[in-house]
Amino acid sequence: MARRRQIYEGKAKILYEGPEPGTLIQYFKDDATAFNAQKRGTINGKGVLNNRISEHVFTLLGNIGVPTHFIRRLNMREQLIRQVEIVPIEVIVRNVAAGTLSKRLGIEEGTQLPRTLIEYCYKDDALGDPLVAEEHIACFNWCSQDELHDIQDMAIRINDFMSGMFAAVGIRLVDFKLEFGRLYEGDFSRIILADEISPDGCRLWDMTTNEKLDKDRFRRDLGGEVEAYQEVARRLGLLPEGGDNAVLDLESHRKKKG
């Protein structure tokens, strides 16, 4: 088998050259980081679960007309995606006060916000992904006004859809992050949804108990990370009800066998 060329490695994923021009292969790792990679660890099986959950969400979003980079899932840990130029802005959509918003503004965690709040962070690990305003985005030309409008419209549409999707399975969508990219088509480009949507980048709370079903379990040393991710997958119908919730990861299985 020919060795694939690695294009980029991030905290949770690796991008490889795709089989056709304009495509990439996105590999989901088990590595876990928090606080801009100041805390590091491993959640066994996380990459497999995130690959499956993200495939499910991106497919549903595509069905309602949200353009995404997702083409298809290749195997347990990999997806075929469209190659895009990433907009250097992390978009955070908030429905409920939690995390840094609660700390910055002194709002009790769990407080329902009077309206959906969209925040922007400049994507730069060395700077700690600082919070920025729309004026910064315009001043430094990180994206055009038209592109920002497209991003805002898609973010609200995604939030409306995902809030309903998760509520239907007893999960409260507290907040989540999105990344967008430019897909070039000849001399023109358009904004599409990129990266992933999974418990790594969403705050998901059980509607009845407020139990955290996301990466906050790792951030706050609560334990039970894999079980929480599995529970999200199970409620979305991606794992069988009852019985063994284990996700078969062939790669890890082979390593254990030696």
Curated annotation (Swiss-Prot):
TM region positions: none
Gene3D superfamilies, sorted: ATP-grasp fold, B domain, Phosphorylase Kinase, domain 1
Reaction(s) the record says it catalyses: 5-amino-1-(5-phospho-D-ribosyl)imidazole-4-carboxylate + L-aspartate + ATP = (2S)-2-[5-amino-1-(5-phospho-beta-D-ribosyl)imidazole-4-carboxamido]succinate + ADP + phosphate + 2 H(+)
Pfam family name, one: SAICAR_synt
Broad EC category: ligase
One biological process term in Gene Ontology: 'de novo' IMP biosynthetic process
Keyword line: ATP-binding, Ligase, Nucleotide-binding, Purine biosynthesis
GO cellular component: cytosol
Protein name, UniProt field: Phosphoribosylaminoimidazole-succinocarboxamide synthase
Organism the protein comes from: Sphingopyxis alaskensis (strain DSM 13593 / LMG 18877 / RB2256) (Sphingomonas alaskensis)
Top-level taxonomy: Bacteria, Pseudomonadati, Pseudomonadota, Alphaproteobacteria, Sphingomonadales
Gene behind the chain: purC
